[in-house]
Amino acid sequence: VPLSPTQLQEHARRLALDHRLDSKPPRNTQLLDRLERTRQWVHQASSDLFEASRLEESVTPAAEWILDNGYLIEGNARDVQLNLTRRFCQELPVLAGGSYRGLPRVYGIAKELVSHADLRLARGHLLAFFEAYQSARALTIGELWAVPQMLRTALIESVQDLAARALTDQREGEIADFWANRLLTANRRDPNHFFSILAELAKTQPSPSPHLATQLIDHLYDEATALVPVQSWLERTLGQSLGDLNLREQSRQTQEQISIGNGFTSLRQLALLDWRKIFERLSRVEQVLRLDPAGVYPELDFDTRDRCRRTIEEFSRRSGQAEEQVAQRVLDLATKAGRESAEEERRSHVGTWLVGEGRREFARLMECREPLRYRAVQWVYRHHSAVYFLAVGFFSALALTLIVGFGLGAESFGVQLGLTLLMLIPVSQLALEVINYLVTRLLPPRVLPKMDFKESGIPDAFRTLVVVPMMLVDEETIRTEVEKLEIRYLANRDENLLFSLFSDYTDAPHLQREDDARLTEIAVQH
């Protein structure tokens, strides 16, 4: 039943209070399996409706929507399957009871929103619904990231229900067409045979649907002698007048047309929303971290903030505490560190404890042991030079030992020593290549935290000079480099972003050349 915006928010709060999570959820992927079955079913239904349209059979308005927009279902289903991996889906909190028992909680929320909003998902209503839900119970970071995919899934399944009704209407229309032709033929040739066919129809369709009834009447409308007995049978069977029945059927088809139109429109609108901004507005963890005592966190770029949030997820999972509680502990730790050591401003920044040098201490305070892989990688980072050169040396020694031992075993010691020295350089080069390859494949890149001043501009405290090196070769080179510098400046207009050239002369046999002063003057003038 469609609800008003206020009713939707109240419904969201009731949902949050009613939902119970499964403490030991089954690690299944039935949601993804359902989505694949839905996608295949809608594809087949679209094919059936297209075939009916090709044969010039009448179709309902809802069926026309499916024929014109069926590709949206296919594309959105593929997008969900691509982004909602099985592993990620298995990590989402699962409901312990109710209509969506055994399914992710965020999926149940999405289904409720879609069904009670009549498939119409405006950005404001969406935000209000999830904020109302979280006023009673917070969602996890993973659940909030899954919201767009769950909304798409809920919309696809709702469109499937409407497509099933449209397909049923289509088949009932074909049945009505079949019986109407038989009744009309009998009425024109042998009126006595007409009633035997009507009796056969009553036996075959003991409880005709309203759509079948209205379609049958439409076919018989111009044949009064056939219409009257059929109308009498239908009114007696359905218990209402055909006028009322026709009004109800028209109302149903109109409502289904509106609903399916809303569904396809919402699928398009979901693709246009900035889900990063929506996520950060809904995330309780984000709201806590933005209280960073150093005031740095809100100025970080999105990827760096996301690294901080992922760390919160990891500690929450290993400690068994809620993500919001973990974020609050980070905030408290940063606040305390800022008061105790005012000269070390960086310790009052929450990022220091999540992605910086304070992470080990925070893990100890949380009584969370870091995963073995993470500890191993951090150990390698701390001893990078020793690890690198020892690995190169070990691989070189191993390769030389194998070559000498198996290839030169019968030679004298002097020959072996001489050949070993000759092969030392190529073998060490091979070792460098192998170790460099392994480093790039096994060690994740160390991404530096970044600031984002795209909207506010670079503040005075971060005034920056970009220095571009160049050689004073000749006048043409200077002119080209100055033009490039001008392009960089025009492409990055900011009062606190400056550009300069760092120049030097080319190599020469003497300390000074005749044109040094001229080239310098040209560079300054330009």
Language-model features, listed with the residues they occupy:
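ATP-dependent phospho-/nucleotidyl transfer catalytic cores
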Residues: 2-103, 128, 132, 145, ...
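Secondary-structure capping and boundary motifs in well-ordered enzyme cores
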Residues: 65, 95-105, 125, 147-155, ...
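Active-site activation/catalytic loop segments of kinase-like enzymes and analogous catalytic loops
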Residues: 75, 102-144, 151-168
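Active-site-adjacent "gating/activation" loops or surface patches in catalytic cores
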Residues: 78, 82-89, 98-112, 364, ...
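Secondary-structure transition/capping motifs at alpha-helix termini
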Residues: 119-122, 136-140, 406-415, 460, ...
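Alpha-helical bilayer-embedded segments of polytopic membrane proteins, i.e.
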Residues: 152-162, 374-436
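Juxtamembrane/interface segments at transmembrane-helix termini
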Residues: 167-168, 408-410, 430-453, 479-482, ...
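Internal catalytic domains of large membrane-associated glycosyltransferases
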Residues: 187-313, 317-377, 446-526
